[in-house]
Amino acid sequence: MLFRSIREIASEKAAIIVRGNRAVTGATDRGDALNVIKRAAASVGAPLTIATHGAVRSRGRDGIEVDLPRLGAVRVGLIGRHQAQNAAVALATLDAMREAGIVDVSDDRIVAGFAAARWPGRLELIDHAFGSDDRRDLLLDGAHNEDGAAALAAAVDDLAPHLRDADGECRMGGESRSNRATLIVAAMSDKAIDRIFGELATSPVLRAARLICTTVGEERSSTPEALADAARRAGLGAAVEIAADPQRALDGAARDRGPVIVAGSLYLVGAVRERLMRQGRLPDDGSLDPEATTGSAESRA
């Protein structure tokens, strides 16, 4: 199993910086990432913009509101406080492109674009019908590394007061069947599962959740039993169960009445999204391709 340091990841990403281009980064001093990127840009004479991180003003079901340079308070239609950093990098990139004459886009259009932003399978909140009289929140997230798991844990805690159960109520907390969340997880065996589950277990909501471990049938997929053992070691989930496949996991989740969270693998999230599209419960925007999204998935924040 291969674990790369932040410095190694930064070095790989900095390789795209070439002479004659501008570079924009949201990297910080964590793991020396910023210094690595600075040196790479300087070595080819590429002007480097370091994005100023925006401060989160509010968080809710429909995204976040963040203070961005020059624009002030802007609504971003993506859930998760980590999206403030991504928004700041996006704005800095657009500004650099405008200065270079590559794009001509007004601030009004930029603000509208942030509000309209959507990311299928990444902290995607769906009002889902589990039955004729059972509509509740279904949260899909492809978190499959430590940073992604940390972002999911923080987002779930932020969302907890707003997540709706099968009775249409927002009453997360405690461990009763009416208000605890159900977390469905699958993961590839070559991932740092203990570390990922350790990050998820930092969330009080996820520690108190009913956990259903499943598999997506890929050759690399970890067994539900191995996931259950890792969850117990991490203290993830107040009750831990096993399901042979995602459909049985969803059927099991329907037996409780709390919100449902699906996470740990883009393959799992993609399978659930495809099922919802076939049922007409999601727009048919194409299935989530784990292989096509691997690059962006590895650098979550």
Map each language-model feature to its residues.
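Surface-exposed, charge/polar-rich loops and edge strands
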Residues: 280
